[in-house]
């Protein structure tokens, strides 16, 4: 099972290596505005799944939200520690 830290490490590596055809690289290249739109979209999908769908579907939507939030963190140059200071 992948952890939040594992995902952040993987996405950081992808951002540095920029493999051809990577969806993460495409999203990063779209910039903060485009990433922000994905975060908002996924947050709405989490809400709808939590209210109207199965636990498994809600978990899937939450995982997608976490992914896009981490892409935003990388785009802004934020680390897990930067965010952790506010928890």
Swiss-Prot record:
Domain of life: Bacteria
Keyword ATP-binding: yes
GO molecular function per UniProt: ATP binding; phosphoribosyl-ATP diphosphatase activity
GO cellular component term of the entry, any: cytoplasm
GO biological process: L-histidine biosynthetic process
Protein localization: Cytoplasm
Pathway annotation from the record: Amino-acid biosynthesis; L-histidine biosynthesis; L-histidine from 5-phospho-alpha-D-ribose 1-diphosphate: step 2/9
Catalytic activity: 1-(5-phospho-beta-D-ribosyl)-ATP + H2O = 1-(5-phospho-beta-D-ribosyl)-5'-AMP + diphosphate + H(+)
Record's keyword terms, sorted: Amino-acid biosynthesis, ATP-binding, Cytoplasm, Histidine biosynthesis, Hydrolase, Nucleotide-binding
Major subcellular location class: cytoplasm
One Pfam family of this chain: PRA-PH
EC number from the UniProt entry: 3.6.1.31
Family note: Belongs to the PRA-PH family.
Listed name of the protein: Phosphoribosyl-ATP pyrophosphatase
Organism encoding this protein: Clavibacter michiganensis subsp. michiganensis (strain NCPPB 382)
Upper taxonomic lineage: Bacteria, Bacillati, Actinomycetota, Actinomycetes, Micrococcales
